[in-house]
A protein has these predicted regions:
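Ribonuclease/tRNase effector modules and their secretory precursors
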Residues: 1-101
């Protein structure tokens, strides 16, 4: 997979959330879950991926442009997101939303 991002946004994200986009790319190497982010009209399809990086569940907002994943933000998953992720794994009801890197 190829990744891209805005460098100023990456630096601001490290300060705000403590997660570097260079580390967030590794989420896509292991099991992860993707949900569509439809909270607003972004003018493009945005998704949020949830997965573990260094034993920490993170959320990565991104958009896919052809074969490139453009990272928009990355942060530690909140408690509600952690529960949703854990429930999906435990129940295996949503296996079509899990992807192996």
């Amino acid at each position: 997979m190829k990744f891209e991002w805005d460098e100023e946004k990456r630096l601001a994200n490290v300060v705000k959330h403590g997660v570097d986009f260079t580390d967030a790319c590794r989420l896509f190497e292991g099991p992860f879950m993707i949900m569509t982010d439809n909270r607003r009209d972004y003018g493009e399809i945005r998704s949020i991926a949830f997965g573990h990086v260094e034993n920490r569940l993170i959320a990565v907002a991104f958009t896919k442009r052809q074969d490139i994943i453009r990272i928009i933000s990355a942060r530690k998953a909140n408690d509600r997101e952690k529960k949703r992720f854990e429930d999906a794994i435990a129940d295996r009801l949503e296996t079509n939303r899990f992807h192996e890197g």
